[in-house]
Amino acid sequence: MAEIEGKVAVITGGASGIGEATVRLFVTEGAKVIIADMQIERGASLAAELGKAAVFCPVEVRQEDQVKAAIDMAVTRWGRLDCMFNNAGFGGALGPIEGVPVEEFDMTFDVLVKGVFLGMKHAIPVMKKQGTGSIINTGSISAITAGRGPLVYSAAKAAVLHLSTVTALSVADCSIRVNAICPGYIATPLSSNTVGKPDKLIEEQLEGKSFPQPIPRVGRPHDIAEMALFLASDRSTFVTGQNFVVDGGAASGVFWEQQNPIYKKYRPIRVYNPDKG
């Protein structure tokens, strides 16, 4: 039996990158999915490719009526909402704090934080009525380690993590789970400044490049989709209020000797053997 057979999900930012990978995986694993995205052509094309299991709904996550419409569409078509994946995002305001325009700061928080808030606001009443549900919010390792992303983006993602945790506590007695996923560097249009290009092309551009993390390969959207699948499935019914870091070990730091090439000549490191001294 498929992992999430018969479940219904709404995935914001579902037309590309992590969202697209998750849509594809969820459909493969038996779910029905609303692809909620502002990329109309790409979202509609993906839905057409996947057939009856996926429906596209144009959504700009700052607009409350559009977020609600996507959730209503899921309930109208399939009678329920098992998973709300608040994943839509963008890089946000750039530059030093003193140079960030207020309107760009506001837009960054509107998309990254308000978008998550609106998704949870309208998903929770449906889930309370049916007595179960899983909410997944996309954070970032920049929310837990400084210097991993633009400063306003990092602050907004930190807000997403705390909003996820406090919301999880408030709805746990309703059997609604709320968790966050913190991706590291993932080969997506957002991270590689290649919006509109196929994900395969993005991976090819990044192939062979090294990354400052214990697992040196670039992360792939499917890596995050697999974690989302776990959180949407019945395997995680006792998991809530948690932040799952999927980053190749980046947030854990870099092994000291990797940063100090001069010491590589001393490898392999001698392991103490109590029998030989």
Map each language-model feature to its residues.
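Conserved mid-core segment of classical short-chain dehydrogenase/reductases
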Residues: 68, 91-106, 129, 149-152, ...
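Active-site helix of classical SDR
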Residues: 120, 156, 164
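Alpha-helical segment proximal to the catalytic Tyr-Lys
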Residues: 125, 169-173, 237
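Catalytic Tyr-X3-Lys loop
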Residues: 98-117, 132, 136, 160, ...
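C-terminal helical subdomain
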Residues: 180, 200-235, 239, 246-248, ...
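Residue(s) in the substrate-gating loop at a strand-loop-helix junction
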Residues: 140
